[in-house]
């Protein structure tokens, strides 16, 4: 444990100071401490010093320097979670500045796809929203046992998975919400299925309580829709008048109105004459048919 030249601290002491200042959130003081370090290559390659430099670069918005540090050095797995957060948050901030608005879940997913984690801070294991599958497996197993872990259990789970206590709490909260939504959807589907099975419809699709078209038609009303078009359009037998001539009696518009002083025809005489012209030929023809 030799002292660094012209500095007065050992390498282990420098690493300890960096860790203490990071955990205390004294980023400005940490930056000044790093600036005061002597130009010793062995010291500047220390992992605690490199991590401290990455934290200072992030808080100062010097993302290019941050990316360079994270990509150029191989970090230990116990530092991966912290450095991965710096990598992703820096890219999120840059994307938000370009777009001029905060990123949603889809926007953050696209950023992660565009800027994947470098292997220097990632062991290559498949991740889902920055959760390793191994960590998710531990959380799922605990959830099956107890969906409501206590604060102490959340801290233990955080240590076992490498996540923060907040991440563990959010995972359980989101999982409970998804399960409640799935249960509500299943209940709704079951209720719809039961209501369909009790629907008062017979096999032909008609309501048992309803009535057919024949029942709706009054008995004294002729069913014009059932008449054959061919029958209506076929010419009448010789000697019989056309069906059109046997239609409804002429309306008021067909009866001539006498003009005062004009000597017009009597409407009553016209009506009797029209009736005779229709009925007399029919009587003669019916007599001929009967003979």
Swiss-Prot record:
Residues 179-190 have a biased composition (Basic and acidic residues). Pfam families: Homeodomain, SIX1_SD. InterPro entries: HD, Homeobox_CS, Homeodomain-like_sf, SIX1_SD. It comes from the Eukaryota. Residues 124-183 bind DNA. Residues 249-259 have a biased composition (Pro residues). Residues 224-233 have a biased composition (Low complexity). GO terms for cellular component: chromatin; nucleus; transcription regulator complex. Belongs to the SIX/Sine oculis homeobox family. This is Homeobox protein SIX2. The lineage of its organism: Eukaryota, Metazoa, Chordata, Craniata, Vertebrata.
């Amino acid at each position: 444990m030799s002292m660094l030249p012209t500095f007065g601290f050992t390498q282990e002491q420098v690493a300890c100071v960096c860790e203490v200042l990071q955990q205390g959130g004294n980023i400005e003081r940490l930056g000044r401490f790093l600036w005061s370090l002597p130009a010793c290559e062995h010291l500047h390659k220390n992992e605690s010093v490199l991590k401290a430099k990455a934290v200072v670069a992030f808080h100062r918005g010097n993302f290019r320097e941050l990316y360079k540090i994270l990509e150029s050095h191989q970090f230990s797995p116990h530092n991966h979670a912290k450095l991965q957060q710096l990598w992703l948050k820096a890219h999120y901030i840059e994307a938000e500045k370009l777009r001029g608005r905060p990123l949603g879940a889809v926007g953050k997913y696209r950023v992660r796809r565009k800027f994947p984690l470098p292997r220097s801070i990632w062991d290559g294991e498949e991740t889902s929203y920055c959760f390793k599958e191994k960590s998710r497996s531990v959380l799922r197993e605990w959830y099956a046992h107890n969906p409501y872990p206590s604060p102490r259990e959340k801290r233990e789970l955080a240590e076992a998975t490498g996540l923060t206590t907040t991440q563990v709490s959010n995972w359980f909260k989101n999982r409970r919400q998804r399960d409640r939504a799935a249960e509500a959807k299943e209940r709704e589907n079951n209720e719809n299925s039961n209501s369909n099975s009790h629907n008062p419809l017979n096999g032909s699709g008609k309501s048992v309580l309803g009535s057919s078209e024949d029942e709706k038609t009054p008995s004294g009303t002729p069913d014009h829709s059932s008449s054959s078009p061919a029958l209506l359009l076929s010419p009448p037998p010789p000697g019989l008048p056309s069906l059109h001539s046997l239609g409804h009696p002429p309306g008021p518009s067909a009866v001539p109105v006498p003009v005062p002083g004009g000597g017009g025809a009597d409407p009553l005489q016209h009506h009797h004459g029209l009736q005779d012209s229709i009925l007399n030929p029919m009587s003669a023809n019916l007599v001929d048919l009967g003979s």
